[in-house]
Amino acid sequence: MNTALRIEIAMKVMNMTEIAFRRRFERPRISRPTRWMFADISIILPGDGWTAIEATFISVMSRKFTVMPPIKIMNVFLGSKARRGWPYPGYDYLGRAREWIAELEDLKSGLSFPVEFVNETASTMDDVRRIEKEMEDVDAILVYILTSESTRFTYLASKAIARFGYDHIHKYGGYDVPTIYVVDLYGGDISALPLVEDLKNIGKKFLMISSSRTSDIARALKCIYTLKMLRNSRVLLITKREANPAKYLSPEYISRIKEKFGTDVRYVDYTDVLKLYNEVDDEEAEKLAKKIFEGAREIREPSFEDLVKATKMYYALKKLMSENNANAVAIDCLGWLEYDKTPMPMTPCIALSLLNSEGFVAACEADLHSAITMLIFRYLAGEPSFISDPVIDTARNVVIHCHCTAPIKFGRRDNPYILRSHSDSGWGVGIQVLVEKGIEVTVAKIIRGLEEMVASTGKVSGNVDVDRGCRTKIEVEVKDAEKYLYGFRGGLHRVLAAGDHLKELEMLGKLIGYKLTLEGE
């Protein structure tokens, strides 16, 4: 299929998505993932209720898009027919490798992102050296330790493969290739267990999967996918640095973010947003405002004219991302209100809510730590997330997560919402989203220094409707609110996403190099 036809199909699908979004954000559900393979390009409509093509592969903003290839995984199956060792002498490791390959193909078909496998087997160190020599650019190496023998081949080969990633840096530039070891139970265990300490001693970032669940391999692949997407992400930091000289907004700190996560951060001035805001077609903004206005459960403070200005801000920020090939923004909204001479035409709360619902990442208060955390949730969990100001109630053992920018799309569904003003300033348009009671949520944040992530899980016990504080207030049960309170650190904000993603966050931390600390335990 030629490129022009691929592009035409992609554009038609995205046009359908845009229409569905405008119809009160009601997207028809798909019973199972649908995969379209166009040569080396994969387009997926996930079977989780989303009709939007994942931003992973095609990011369409104002008719501009980027096609992302699938993640490329090299599977290396290590084994030998030794006279002594596990599973038993003369074991058919090649037959076992074929079984693994079949299992991996089945696993791949159920993923919500495309994966390309390159399969290799090795029974001698010469095979290992050949694989290293022939290895092309890959996103990760998965090493399957099938046997443990008296010659210690699989142990020594596994250590040698750990060096592939470092050599890859010099060959291709950029980052170490993540290495994931899979222990074939009752076969590779004796070789694998001593390997853990050895790899830690050389500072290797790796995962060791010793599990009878193939879903753990799927989790690892999701981490690789997230890593790749972080390295292909760009955040637009909308602020005035001279007016907001916080250390974590400095060029030096942004360089650390690039080094750690591979994510590009670019400074943008408020005047650039205002210019695009003034260029937005009023009729287009009014149409979207009408849909949002009619879809609200209740309108309290804002007028329809306020909402039109809010949708113009949405279109302006979306155009800004398009022009800068970005998929995320972090806007210093409170700073704009407080100290900038450029008048702010409207609070960006609704714009951020819509962008997050749509699959982009939009963070307020120029919070880069939260923006990176939101990007992680976007790709690791496949979920919109939002920044919160936590309120801790030790009497009821809950934390209430408050903000004015919550996405309407949260917990795999479109939630009821009330149109409000922005609470801090008392003007503009904010949003009060009422999320489903009983759903599991993960609360997390990369904290200052980028070496640690704090995280917790809990169930939504309700939505609080009081005028004090930010508009959306999601009440979450925690294990120990007292411990949560006295252990709180890393700045005010937290990021909330639907689902329990602690295991994936922990695995990702082992590959990126951050420590996961549980809050409130």
Give residue ranges: language-model regions:
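N-terminal, intrinsically disordered, basic low-complexity segments enriched in Arg/Pro/Ser/Thr
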Residues: M1-I9, M14-K64
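Metallocofactor- and cofactor-centric catalytic cores in central/energy metabolism, strongly enriched
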Residues: F65-L193, I217-Y225, P251, S255, ...
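Ser/Thr/Gly-rich flexible loops in soluble cytosolic domains mediating phosphotransfer, phosphorylation
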Residues: I180-K200, G359-F377
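Short, glycine-/small-residue-rich phosphate/pyrophosphate-handling segment
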Residues: Y186-T226, R378-T405
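Conserved anion/nucleotide-ligand pocket segment
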Residues: I224-R256, K260, V399-N415
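Long, internal scaffold/assembly segments composed of regular secondary structure
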Residues: A289-Y379
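C-terminal catalytic subdomain
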Residues: N356-V464
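Extended hydrophobic packing segments that form well-structured cores
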Residues: G428-E521
